[in-house]
Amino acid sequence: MARGSRPVYVISIAASLAGCHPRTLRIYEEEGLVDPVRTDSNIRLYSDEDLQRVRIIRYLTQRRGVNLAGVKMLLQLREAADLLQEIADAIDSEDESSPNEPKNQRMEL
């Protein structure tokens, strides 16, 4: 499940909202493209962020002709880019908080 979003939709409702069949959501889960939360009774629950991800997957597959392996790679690249942006933002805020410190001393990898 995507972080920061509360899971509320059972698979039939989620599929209807995303414009696909419930089996499609199961396939996306099997392929590791979505990860819905499961209840104690093993019912899948989808969040709004999960549904947004499904819409992205459907756009890439149906409109752009990308296969599921390609979609998985693109989503991983998107997540990596988001992480890199967070790191860059953190470095920028560190730079602003200590402007007198030389940059080569602040960033040691």
Task: Please report, for each region that a protein language model flagged, where it lies by residue.
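Short coil turns linking two alpha-helices in DNA-binding domains
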Residues: 21-23
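Arg/Lys-rich, alpha-helical DNA-contact motif
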Residues: 1-16, 30, 35-41, 48-109
